[in-house]
């Protein structure tokens, strides 16, 4: 099990990222627009820098939904490889069977 504080911190990052996603993407699209003057683009960069760091989507860590493990998490299931193997072995994941040949 991962520390509860690290799981909670990641959850708050997800919420903050979702709430400020539209604002952040609008600023980025204006910054990369070459038709806007350099001074105005610089002011947009400064306003982007004023947003909280945790509102960036790159700060979010994929964690296992069951254990909170930060590494070895499959995107399709959202579960770490260890728990996924365990659940598949018990037959609890529908549509997935252990291969044998």
From Swiss-Prot:
Q: Where is the composition biased (Basic residues)?
A: 11-26
Q: Which GO CC terms are listed, alphabetically?
A: cytoplasm; small ribosomal subunit
Under Gene Ontology molecular function, one entry of this record is: rRNA binding
Keyword check for Lipid biosynthesis: no
Q: Which domain of life is it from?
A: Bacteria
Stretch list, region Disordered: 1-26
Question: Which protein is depicted?
Answer: Small ribosomal subunit protein uS14
């Amino acid at each position: 099990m991962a520390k509860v504080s690290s799981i909670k911190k990641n959850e708050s990052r997800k919420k903050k990222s979702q709430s400020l996603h539209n604002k952040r993407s609008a600023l980025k699209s204006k910054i990369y627009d070459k038709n806007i003057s350099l001074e105005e683009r610089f002011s947009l960069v400064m306003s982007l820098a004023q947003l909280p760091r945790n509102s960036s989507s790159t700060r979010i860590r994929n964690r296992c939904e069951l254990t909170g493990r930060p590494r070895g998490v499959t995107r399709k299931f959202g579960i770490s490889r260890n728990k996924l193997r365990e659940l598949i072995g018990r037959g609890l994941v529908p549509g997935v069977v252990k291969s044998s040949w």
